[in-house]
């Protein structure tokens, strides 16, 4: 895989699903960009514009949007995006 995409994780504090995803990201050693929707107005607006809600975690992988993905789903999306 060359020119690997960096996933963008939209999240918020106290989100148990976000903690689960971040745990998987850490185990896999992935580099991600994180954007806290409670502190980043642009991230919150992006989330509302792209999916029409503030459901987190939402991960952007290129043009693909993953809402509350498992680490397995995220890894599959990265493999597909980096083909």
Task: Give the predicted meaning of each segment.
Residues 19-26, 48, 75, 79:
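Class I S-adenosyl-L-methionine
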Residues 1-28:
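Local sequence-structure signature of Cys/Sec-based thiol-disulfide redox active-site neighborhoods
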Residues 31-44:
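Thiol-based oxidoreductase modules, predominantly thioredoxin-like and allied folds used
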Residues 2-3, 45-48:
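Short secondary-structure transition/capping segments
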Residues 51-59:
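Structural micro-motif
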Residues 61-83:
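Non-catalytic, surface beta->alpha helical segment in thiol-disulfide oxidoreductase systems
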Residues 6-8, 31-34, 63-65:
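Short active-site oxyanion
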Residues 16-17, 42, 73:
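Short alpha-helical
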């Amino acid at each position: 895989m060359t020119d690997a995409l960096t996933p963008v994780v939209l999240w918020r504090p106290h989100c148990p699903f976000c903690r689960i995803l971040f745990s998987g990201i850490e185990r896999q050693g992935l580099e991600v960009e994180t954007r806290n929707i409670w502190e980043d107005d642009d991230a919150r607006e992006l989330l509302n514009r792209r999916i029409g809600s503030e459901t987190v975690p939402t991960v952007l992988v290129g043009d693909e949007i993953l809402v509350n993905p498992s680490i397995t789903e995220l890894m599959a999306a990265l493999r597909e995006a980096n083909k």
